[in-house]
Amino acid sequence: MTLTLIAINVLIFVIMVVKGVSAIEPRPEDLLLWGADFGPLTLAGGQWWRLFTACFLHFGIIHIGFNMYVLYQVGMTTEFLYGRAKYLFIYLLAGVGGNIVSLYVHPDSVGAGASGAIFGVYGAFLGFLLIRRSVIPKLAMAQMVRSAVIFLGINLVYGVMSRSTDLSAHIGGLAIGFVLGCYLSHSPAAVRNA
């Protein structure tokens, strides 16, 4: 499922570029035409589908490149832990939820990107580590927690310093993913895969 999600994101980006959208720095108007999130359209215009479609659009090749690299890194492990269906559920709900939080905090900004969904996958991974910690060897647990904390710390600090990073979508996705991860970690698939 992780590879499928990466392929979908990349395919949409390539189609957008072929259709004339800049690969380096897409204009907000172009992203809106493709389904980016934007308060006046999503809320006032009743175009709620934008909460979903925005999860598959990106602000340029660097944005999608970094997002897909991170999704691959954390996604493969998290997918193994939860199984395909639950993993997809986490990804989509965290992405949409992150966009809802972003819309609440920045109603007049154009929002796009898989970051909320990816932070949700990270949150689910951390939820699994918390709930299933008794079955994970201590050294492996320490390495995984350290790696996750470094990644999240760097991204959250960068998000505070960068005006172009939607920290609210990141935090919203992370929180939703963590809650879902804690809940779903009690499932038989998660126990079997531990």
What do these predicted ranges mean?
Residues 1-194:
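A detector for small-residue-rich transmembrane helices and their helix-helix packing motifs
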